[in-house]
Amino acid sequence: MEGRVSEETRGEKIGRRLKTVPTRFIGLLVVTVLFPVLLVAALVTDVVRALTAHRPFMATRLLLIGWIYLAGEVVCIAAFALTWLFTIGPRRAERLERSAWNIQQRWAPSLFRPLCTLFRLRFTIEGADQAEPGPVLVFIRHASIIDNLLPSVVVAGPHELNLRYLIKRELRNDPGLDIGGDRLRNYFVR
């Protein structure tokens, strides 16, 4: 991509992805196979907590969100791999970027909606019309994991804006963010 300088070599990037990508596939496989046992354990934990400490069911919801996250990561990684394999031609970089944006616009709501449903979260968006037609600067204060999804769900998707992100370099350990982030010309910072 034009104008980008990477602080890592191609070998370092491939090495990192050889470590991080399999963890998502193995994680999804393990959680899926053990899901019945994990669900019973989560339900027992939640019932005991509800009866003794009057706490809401949290373990069950976290298990469900964990599985949804892993499934979403695996689907994204597979989609990135397929688009990389089948996107050829003179405008390959541009088409890979567009496909990554489309993948992101399906991934973010696929995590955001279940989070909102399971944790009964409600959001009110004021001034959303201010994002059009762009250019626009969006500042999101990172206080929780959900905050990572908000720009895509609230601004980029509804207004079809291809946002660029400044992302903590440590988030390259999430292969979906790593691969998609590179294709969307985001900047990973220290």
List the predicted regions and their residue ranges:
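Catalytic core of membrane glycerolipid acyltransferases/transacylases, capturing the structured
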Residues: 80-110, 117, 132, 136-190
